[in-house]
């Protein structure tokens, strides 16, 4: 009971679709929540998808798609590894270090559990994907299509260590990170299909594609929060630096 628990999974999805000869649509949403057999292994995800297909004229078509998702991988303890899981999640006992000879209750056990479970990890990620496609047929066989799509992903993480874990300075520490990635793509195509004497088929294709990617990341840390209830760096926090691989004030 100190190390494992009963796992639980909730997976709910709702979808609706319909339309007519000119317009069709599909809208769906989902929620996924998992509580693993190890303490602190919770995972949550929500997503929404929308597809719309339009054909206002016989030679004109329009497709639009949108996808949104949010995931939460927050944990009650652990290192500040950005987006990475740990071999030992939020346990009430550390099977790699805790001796089986220790008593069930007492100061030793309380201190061990305090060190193990007091750190707080927050990890969130967002994803937005959208695309728009337009097709127009000038004459039979001659068709022009243009499309534009974008994909943006952002992940954020924060690790907080309360003041009572710092035996030297009695200062809380907070480490925050953010990373964002974006991909933008545009494509223009002109195709022409024809045949000669219904025996020789030809398919000509002209076009170009443009792709642009961008990436940005931020990192910051601070110490000396006025309260262990405040887990994020605010104005007035002490500056920090790295010493022997540790964040110190």
Where are these regions (language model features)?
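Residues embedded in well-ordered regular secondary structure
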Residues: 1-39, 77-80, 114-122, 135-137
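Surface-exposed loop/interface segments of Gram-negative outer-membrane beta-barrel transport/assembly proteins
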Residues: 1, 36-41, 47, 51-129, ...
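Active-site and adjacent substrate-binding regions of carbohydrate-active enzymes
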Residues: 141
């Amino acid at each position: 009971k100190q190390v494992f628990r009963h796992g639980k999974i909730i997976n709910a999805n709702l979808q609706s679709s319909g339309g007519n000869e000119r317009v069709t649509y599909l809208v769906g949403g989902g929620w996924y929540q998992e509580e693993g057999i190890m303490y602190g292994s919770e995972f949550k995800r929500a997503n929404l998808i929308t597809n719309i297909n339009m054909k206002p004229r016989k030679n004109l078509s329009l497709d639009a798609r949108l996808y949104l998702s949010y995931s939460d991988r927050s944990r009650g303890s652990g290192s500040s590894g950005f987006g990475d899981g740990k071999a030992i999640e939020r346990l009430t006992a550390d099977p790699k270090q805790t001796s089986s000879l220790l008593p069930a209750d007492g100061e030793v056990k309380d201190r061990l559990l305090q060190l193990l479970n007091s750190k707080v990890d927050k990890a969130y990620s967002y994803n937005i994907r959208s695309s728009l496609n337009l097709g127009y047929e000038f004459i039979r066989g001659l068709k022009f299509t243009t499309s534009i799509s974008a994909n943006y992903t952002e992940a954020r993480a924060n690790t907080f260590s309360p003041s009572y874990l710092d035996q030297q300075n009695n200062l809380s520490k907070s480490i925050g990170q953010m990373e964002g990635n974006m991909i933008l793509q545009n494509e223009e195509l002109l195709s022409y299909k024809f045949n000669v004497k219904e025996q020789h088929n030809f398919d000509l294709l002209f076009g170009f594609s443009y792709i642009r990617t961008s990436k940005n990341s931020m990192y910051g840390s601070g110490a000396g929060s006025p309260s262990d209830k405040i887990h994020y760096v605010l104005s007035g926090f002490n500056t920090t630096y790295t010493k022997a691989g540790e964040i110190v004030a």
